Amino acid sequence: MIPCRATLSFARCLIRRKVVTLDSLEDSKLCRCLSTMDLIALGVGSTLGAGVYVLAGEVAKADSGPSIVVSFLIAALASVMAGLCYAEFGARVPKTGSAYLYTYVTVGELWAFITGWNLILSYVIGTSSVARAWSGTLDELLNKQIGQFFRTYFKMNYTGLAEYPDFSAVCLILLLAGLLSFGVKESAWVNKVFTAVNILVLLFVMVAGFVKGNVANRKISEEFLKNISASAREPPSENGTSIYGAGGFMPYGFTGTLAGAATCFYAFVGFDCIATTGEEVRNPQKAIPIGIVTSLLVCFMAYFGVSAALTLMMPYYVLDEKSPLPVAFEYVGWGPAKYVVAAGSLCALSTSLLGSMFPLPRILFAMARDGLLFRFLARVSKRQSPVAATLTAGVISAVMAFLFDLKALVDMMSIGTLLAYSLVAACVLILRYQPGLSYEQPKYCPEKEALGSCASAASKSKSQVTVLPEWGFSLRAFFSPSLLPTKQSASLVSFLVGFLAFLILGLSILTTYGVHAIARLEAWSLALLVLFLVLCVAVVLTIWRQPQNQQKVAFMVPFLPFLPAFSILVNIYLMVQLSADTWIRFSIWMALGFLIYFAYGIRHSLEGNSRDEDEDEDTHSNNVHTAAEEKSAIQANDHHQRHLSLPFIFHEKTSEC
């Protein structure tokens, strides 16, 4: 019995949930000074990085052609699905932590640590790679004099290291780390200036493109493309068409447009940094959803406009993949405009760098405050900024940018981001089908009808960790759900969400690695495809039939459960597309994370310590009560440990520092 009890106790530690109360919201040590406009600027600056100056040309030439505008539309719709899930959690749980916190309060501590640990990796690599890109852009403007100097005197000939140490990237990272340590208000002001310049440059590109553009560039015939290929002595493609496609608006067909959309999806990554500002916004319940949705809309309009202008200015097949906009302006006779584009590119890289550095210390701060990482990272300065986490993040990112060649590591950013998107969407599904939520105390009391009251369970005012709610469901809940959510319906939905993720993973692997078998109509592949599709549809429809919680918050995801389910599908499919080398590196990073968690985090978890204190108090109380009172207290405490805790709905907080 003892080993079984120890195993059960260990399992409870892994799935214990964080409870966020009104008291903990008021206890924030960070400065609440950001406005809705600050969040929009932060989201736009982080998302609308240098990719807008490069990605459009690359995708248009290789995948989509003029239909790149459709690719960006599809990618934007897929990104909005993830954004809406973040927006609902931002309205429900306006605390620092983003996807890490949302996972912690919904599915438990282990998944929360995995999410936070991978977000740390994503932001570190993102910060370092953007800093090196900023340094490279500056070097291009100076005719590559900086790079030539360091190659001559500081060249590094070691596998895995950069060609030369990038002092410019280090100085930039440390400068921004100092700015972020000084205060969030000052950082937001600098971000708004750079974002405004970036938007103005992109507006100039759009206007110039529509003025100098030619609609004929979208109506290029297939015969014309074949003649060009023949004159260049380039062999035709496998289907006999030109290597530049069949011409027209979709030269590579709708499959090419979809392939372009998969690439363009990553252009919208970055809005999640808004969700880390929950304790620094004056009105988080409204500001965070508005900031996320508006920033994605602005970014889509920018990507749509720039890509449309670019494919009007010059034929898609002659676009330059590395510097499409400067080459396009030279093509139409506006060569000096490339300096305007260069200035906008530097501003875009600056805001993108700030957007990567801003959430990183806040994830470190949130995990350290909960005890899952080292406590010194939770120190706050007199200006109410997470200074220890900010400086630590800056030093780590600076070392990465200084020494390493990050090209091989960039794909690892995608794992952390896509995993976070998937978990947040799954958490929204689980959350919305839970029994009634209250503001501070246990939200579901199954003993109420039997005992007449659950006052003894609700008497404690402080937050409690929740472990091992009563799982299990009946066939009646499956085939004939009740009108209101119950413990059984909530357990059923939680199980089905996990099963749906498993089915989507299998479907993604099949359509990725068995696509040729499906194309050849092989029986086994078609049978598996039909099985996965039927089961996915059945699971989603079963979830749809379950009763939802009717409590309202400032923002709620529409079209439940279809929208979050489709978001999970998109994210898992994109994760499966990553290379085996990327997953091997990811496994090494996760092994390091599990070492830290099981050696330090699981023993220092604030939620675990709170639970131990509560158990000690209950033991002392039980020793001094009568036998009848002792029995009643044990029953109440048993319920308190079993009830399913979920995020609270907070009153709006609008006070300013």
From Swiss-Prot:
InterPro entries: AA/rel_permease1 (IPR002293), Cat_AA_permease (IPR004755), CAT_C (IPR029485). Pfam families: AA_permease_2 (PF13520), AA_permease_C (PF13906). Functions as a permease involved in the transport of the cationic amino acids (L-arginine, L-lysine, L-ornithine and L-homoarginine). May play a role in classical or alternative activation of macrophages via its role in arginine transport. The chain crosses the membrane at residues 39-59, 67-87, 105-125, 164-184, 193-213, 249-269, 290-310, 340-360, 386-406, 410-430, 490-510, 524-544, 555-575, 582-602. One of its GO terms (molecular function) is L-lysine transmembrane transporter activity. NCBIfam families: 2A0303. This is Cationic amino acid transporter 2. One of its GO terms (cellular component) is plasma membrane. Its main location: membrane.
